């Protein structure tokens, strides 16, 4: 008799359809955002990184190489499926002479630090943004992250001091 009851429970469990699992209605579920985080955000981040590096004077090939490295490091930190890092800033330190120093400090850059200051900070991320301690986080999309100045402006003022400004625009 006990064997028959167990068999009935298994049959009932197999009849549960995936559509009956309320993933969208569950505010703590991350499945609806899986595609957005793992596909859309890295693609846009890579394009913006390459665009910014080209504007700084790198060749297209060099910009593509640096853009790949930077975006792979940061997006891997943002993906829960790949574990994330302990600290994104130390992971990205020294990735390139343009991105390694921080606070808008650049080597041999004739135009301005403003472009670098914008998209470097958005690529690096932060401890809060990658949700290291909170296990049931509400995931973000690329639109919710600070938009780099590379995507917001087309002209830059040479010699403008950006260290006292926000990295992603003025309110």
Swiss-Prot record:
The keyword Amino-acid biosynthesis does not apply. One of its GO terms (cellular component) is viral capsid. Induction: Expressed in the late phase of the viral replicative cycle. It is found in: Virion. It comes from the Viruses. Keywords: Capsid protein, Late protein, Virion. Signal peptide: none annotated. Interacts with the major capsid protein. One of the minor capsid proteins that constitute a network internal to the major capsid proteins and outside the lipid membrane. The minor capsid proteins glue and stabilize the capsomers. This is Minor capsid protein 3. The gene is A523R.
């Amino acid at each position: 008799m006990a064997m028959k009851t167990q068999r009935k429970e298994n049959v009932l469990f197999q009849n549960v359809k995936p559509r009956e699992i309320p993933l969208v209605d569950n505010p703590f579920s991350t499945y609806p955002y899986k595609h957005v985080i793992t596909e859309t955000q890295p693609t846009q981040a890579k394009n913006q990184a390459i665009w910014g590096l080209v504007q700084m004077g790198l060749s297209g090939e060099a910009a593509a190489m640096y853009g790949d490295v930077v975006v792979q490091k940061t997006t891997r930190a943002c993906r829960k499926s790949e574990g994330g890092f302990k600290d994104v800033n130390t992971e990205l330190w020294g990735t390139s002479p343009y991105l390694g120093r921080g606070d808008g400090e650049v080597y041999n850059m004739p135009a301005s630090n403003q472009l670098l200051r914008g998209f470097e900070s958005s690529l690096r991320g932060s401890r809060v943004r990658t949700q290291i301690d909170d296990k049931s986080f509400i995931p973000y999309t690329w639109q919710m992250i600070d938009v780099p100045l590379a995507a917001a402006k087309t002209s830059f003022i040479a010699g403008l001091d950006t260290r006292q400004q926000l990295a992603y625009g003025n309110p």
